[in-house]
Amino acid sequence: MNVKATQNASTEKTEKGWRLGIQKGDSLSYRDAQLDDYSLLPRRKFPHRSITLNLRAKVTSSSLPGTWGFGLWNDPFGLSLGFGGSPFRLPALPNAVWFFYASPQNYLSFTGDKPAQGFLAQTFRSPIFHPLLIPAGLALPFSRKATRNLLGKIIAEDSSALSVDVTQWHGYRLEWSAKRSAFWVDDVLAFESPVSPHASRPLGVIIWIDNQFAAFTPEGKIGFGVLENPEPAWLELEDLKIVSV
């Protein structure tokens, strides 16, 4: 795994795993600590086409500013550009399957009927190209709401809010295959969806905590940036096991 941290963030190896932390700070700088297995690779060579991921995890608070989580994605926005030595990647439509926490400033959904904040089990499945991308791009300068509605027809997504005390240790398991995505908490199936990223588009594992927010609301409002951390925050994990199927 690649181990990375921005300024005012840290990664610490523990007896059974890792502790990823970000320091107390204002909303002027990005703070991120992460583990991944893809950031040195071009997107077409990301390592996984189906996987089972197991770990135990807890965080400092159930209401942290920013985002944190663990799972797989295609790094659609080239976010690893924030770290030196990472390859350039053009933006892409999202493909992801993950346990994802988003503070209230975030809204990462392209439909109006799925939860997009709090602690979620979430999946996105997108094509490489779709004819509706052309009118979506043309509509963006004039109507962000129309663009969002068109993207909602292109990007398949599914999510479920999870009722879990994330400040306590829990076991999490994610199963991704071409036909389904399944999310387990303490060996109990918490969510299952037929919306699953195509195996033809490989994904990479990411485990992270940061102070970032991004939103594309149902009203068409776009927002992104970084948030203040009134207190230090950390994500601790142990017993990480990744099995490619």
Stretches found by the model and what they are:
Residues M1-I22:
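Extracellular glycan-recognition surfaces and repeat-rich motifs
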Residues G17, T52, R180-A182:
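Structural motif
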Residues R19-K145:
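Secretory/extracellular carbohydrate-interaction modules
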Residues S50-T52, S62-L64, G118, H198-V245:
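Ligand-recognition surfaces built from glycine- and aromatic
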Residues G112-S126, A146-G171:
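Short, aromatic/His-centered strand-loop micro-motif at the edge of beta-sheets
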Residues Q168-W176, S181-F183:
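Short tryptophan-centered beta-strand motifs in secreted/extracellular beta-sheet-rich domains
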